[in-house]
Each structure stands twice: as structure tokens, then as C-alpha cells.
């Protein structure tokens, strides 16, 4: 990595090659790793300027922190409802969810979170990608009507489910299945939403719950978020099945201005 002063340093790129958005020659914003930590590099990549110049919050931990900040400020109330408390990594039965929210009446909302960094492209367009990453093209017409959509997940089909089905993220498929099971067992007693992990104390819970998923679209150039069969067939099967069973899917967009993140509203989802 060539720094602004011309020197060269090693930087860690976490999260499965940052979703394929970090390519040779890309501009990045770095954070300095703490001395004496477990990482072997002095820096970690936090933001990447994707093709077109849009800053992407590609580091996985950014999504968690942004979701926590949005919840603390009440910015997700339109999707998740108002709440008076938020507990992170709460255990519900055999599943540990990212958030457990509670409203003034004691009704709970269970929340799981997914960070979204990749987008689709107009058909016929080209952009560099690391080996093994393919562009996901829009299913809609090109031209002035094209509106970029965020896509989750994007990556190599290098993981497998228990039945041997290949997928991009076994963890994501597992979470959607678990949320669907919660929704099936809920009986409408408790709301459950999936948004993104943040820090905080864990708490064991046992009540039944419904379920939902909220994607954090960590780039400001997308107008919706989609689970595409062309990027991960396994999740493209499980997500609509979960939605039909009562799992709600929500999304919000983050727009970056340098190192500052701005909440940029809720987005429609397509599962």
C-alpha cells in the first residue's frame, strides 16, 4: 500500500477481500492498528473508493458500529419501531442475535445485521475485480432508467452448507434459516429484526419471537438492496422463503464524506 507521503506499508484487508471492491490502484482510507495487537500489519483498510469514486465502508466492523449508532439515535424507528433499550448479542433459544430491542410496553424486537458493500452494474459495463469475483449485472434495462442496486452477498462460491450446496456465506444462510425458525415459532408474541451487530452486553432470553433482516448498505450510490440468484443461489432460495414465513427485510444507506458517515435513509429491499 502506497501512503500519501509516498512511503509503502502493509495494510490488512479483512472480510473476504473486502467484498471484491479493493483492487489494484484503488484509493483507500486506513486506520492505524494498535501496537502490540494480534494483527501483523501497521494499518487496516476501512474505506475503499469504488469505481465511480463512491466511498465504500468495506471493513466489516464499520457496519456493526454504524448500526449501533443508528439505533442509539432512533434512526431506524420507522423500520424497527421505537425502543427504550438495546442489548447486543442476546441469546434467544439456541440462537444469538445481534440486537434485542425492547419498547416501552416490553415488546421485544430481535435484530440480526448484514453489511453490504457490493453493487450491481448496468449490462455491458466493465470494472476490475479480484480473481474469482464476477460482476453482478442488473436484470433491468440499461440507459437512463438504470438505478444501481446494492447486492448481498457477493464473492466466491467457496463455502458449503450441510447438504453440500455451495454458497458465498454459510453464516448468512444459517442466520436467515434461524430467523425463519423464530418467525415460525413466534405466534406474533415478539417482533424480530435483523440489522447489524454492535458492541454490548449479552443477555439470555427465552420468549418466542418473529424475525426480520436489515441490511446496512455501506455506500451512497445505491437505491435499493437485492439478494440475487446470480451471486449466491443458496441465499436467493432461503431469503424469499424466510420472507414468506414472516421474516421482514429492511435496509438503510450510509453515505461517506471523507472519514465521516452520514445516515442516508431507508432503502427498499428485493428478496
Regions found by a protein language model. Give the residues of each.
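Metal-dependent nuclease catalytic cores in nucleic-acid-processing enzymes
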Residues: 28, 173-192, 199-211, 243
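SH3/SH3-like beta-barrel fold
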Residues: 1-3
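A short acidic/basic microdomain associated with nuclease active sites
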Residues: 75-94, 98-100
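Conserved catalytic cores of phosphodiester-cleaving nucleases, focusing on short active-site segments
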Residues: 97-161, 165, 179
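Terminal, basic amphipathic appendages of nucleotide-handling enzymes
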Residues: 22-24, 28-73
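Conserved RecA-like P-loop NTPase helicase motor core
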Residues: 166-170
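Beta-strand/loop nucleic-acid-binding surfaces
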Residues: 6-22
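N-terminal targeting/trafficking signals and adjacent low-complexity tails
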Residues: 191-193, 199-200, 210-211, 218-271
Amino acid at each position: 500500500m502506497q501512503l500519501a507521503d509516498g512511503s509503502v506499508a502493509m495494510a490488512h484487508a479483512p472480510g473476504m477481500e473486502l467484498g471484491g471492491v479493493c483492487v489494484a490502484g484503488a484509493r483507500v482510507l486506513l486506520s492505524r492498528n494498535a501496537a502490540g495487537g494480534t494483527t501483523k500489519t501497521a494499518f487496516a483498510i476501512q474505506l475503499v473508493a469504488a469505481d465511480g469514486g463512491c466511498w465504500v465502508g468495506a471493513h466489516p466492523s464499520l457496519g456493526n458500529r454504524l448500526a449501533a449508532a443508528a439505533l442509539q439515535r432512533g434512526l431506524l424507528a420507522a423500520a424497527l419501531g421505537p425502543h427504550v433499550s438495546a442489548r447486543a448479542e442476546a441469546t434467544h433459544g439456541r440462537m444469538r442475535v445481534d440486537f434485542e430491542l425492547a419498547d416501552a410496553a416490553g415488546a421485544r424486537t430481535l435484530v440480526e445485521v448484514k453489511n453490504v458493500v457490493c453493487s450491481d452494474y448496468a449490462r455491458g459495463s466493465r470494472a476490475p475485480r479480484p480473481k474469482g469475483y464476477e460482476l453482478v449485472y442488473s436484470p433491468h434495462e440499461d440507459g437512463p432508467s438504470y438505478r444501481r442496486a446494492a447486492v448481498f452477498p457477493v464473492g466466491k462460491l467457496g463455502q458449503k452448507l450441510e447438504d453440500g450446496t455451495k454458497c458465498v456465506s454459510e453464516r448468512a444462510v444459517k442466520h436467515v434459516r434461524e430467523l425463519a425458525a423464530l418467525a415460525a415459532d413466534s405466534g406474533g408474541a415478539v417482533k424480530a429484526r435483523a440489522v447489524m451487530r454492535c458492541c454490548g452486553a449479552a443477555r439470555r432470553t427465552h420468549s418466542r419471537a418473529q424475525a426480520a433482516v436489515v441490511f446496512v448498505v455501506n455506500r451512497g450510490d445505491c437505491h435499493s438492496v437485492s439478494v440475487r440468484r446470480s451471486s449466491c443461489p443458496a441465499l436467493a432460495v432461503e431469503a424469499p422463503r424466510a420472507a414468506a414465513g414472516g421474516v421482514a427485510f429492511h435496509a438503510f444507506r450510509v453515505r461517506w464524506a471523507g472519514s465521516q458517515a452520514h445516515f442516508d435513509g431507508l432503502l427498499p429491499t428485493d428478496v
